[in-house]
Regions:
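Gly/Gly-Pro-rich "capping" loops immediately C-terminal to redox-active cysteine motifs
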Residues: 40-68
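Axial heme c-ligation environment in periplasmic c-type cytochrome domains
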Residues: 47-48, 68-95, 102-105
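The canonical Cys-X-X-Cys-His
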Residues: 35-41, 98, 102
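Sec/Tat signal peptide C-region and signal peptidase I cleavage site
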Residues: 5, 14-23
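Bacterial N-terminal signal peptides that target proteins for export
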Residues: 1-7
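Local sequence-structure signature of Cys/Sec-based thiol-disulfide redox active-site neighborhoods
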Residues: 25-33, 44
Length: 107
């Protein structure tokens, strides 16, 4: 029991095996570098930053789905999203941070 508690404390301390929450503040920087190119102008059906109506149906699908579509890419009725906004060098976490930032502008 004592070893388990120590191991769990170590994992929590170093973030090993623990899902990290997306960071909207970090995501703002990614947005300004990458995402703005489509999401400021609504290119290819991209919902514009801060447009609650455009994001409503997407938000209803859940943040996990939005993260998946942003990371893997998506084509649907409302438009298309290239994987990682065309920047495949971005980490999945950076993309999730950018999604969190965009969602923070419409909640």
């Amino acid at each position: 029991m004592k070893r388990t508690a120590i191991a769990l404390a170590g994992f929590a301390m170093f973030g090993v095996g623990v899902a990290q929450a997306a960071d909207a503040a970090k995501g703002e920087e990614i947005y300004k570098q990458v995402c703005f190119a489509c999401h400021d102008a609504g290119v290819a059906g991209a919902p514009k930053l801060g447009d609650k109506a455009a994001w409503k149906d997407r938000i209803a699908k859940g943040e996990a789905t939005l993260d998946k579509h942003a990371i893997e890419g998506f084509t649907g009725e409302a438009g298309s999203m290239p994987p990682k906004g065309g920047r495949t060098d971005l980490s999945d976490e950076a993309v999730k941070d950018a999604v969190a930032y965009m969602l923070s502008t419409v909640k």
